[in-house]
Amino acid sequence: MTEPDGSRTEPLGQVDALAVPRFAGLRTFARLPTLEQVERADVAVLGAPFDSAATFRAGARFGPAAIREASLLLRPYNERLEIAPFAAVQIADAGDAPASPIGVEEGHAAIEAAAGEIAGAGACVLGLGGDHSVTLPLLRAAAAAHGPLSLLQLDAHTDTWDSYFGARYTHGTVFRRAVEEGIVDGGASLQIGLRGSL
């Protein structure tokens, strides 16, 4: 936690790789503390292990675990950029939202509730998906805490279908729903990297 004078009253950053080898210990994002280990987080990493709204290939539900596994090699200092990203703000791993794989609405509700609790406590949520549909409940939680959002979307597709096989909530309908629900201001948002037909 940061005191008014700028000092910290709790550990900040990653587990020391010289004290605990990278292959050992709790699997958190970048070996950062869990949300329970810190008094307050500036950023909370939340896994959204959900892919029931994918229309082609399943498996994205394993994304949060794979990202955490790959993040074990992240270093506390980036020499090329000359920054120590984990020393500037308190980042903690909030674990995974208990998203049911059976129903899209139920899965999204669990993700939104978990993200809403974090955002309501004042932390920025960094979501790890999951299929693209997990963006909608994350955006809902952020908008509930901050009001309508401007969106910078880096993607090959717009994800603005109206429906797919009659379903209005899929990985390809996320941003249409977000604009329709008023949680994203389409006029103040930008999509970068688009290719293909949709």
What are these regions (language model features)?
Residues T2-L198:
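Conserved alpha-helical scaffold segments that buttress catalytic/binding sites
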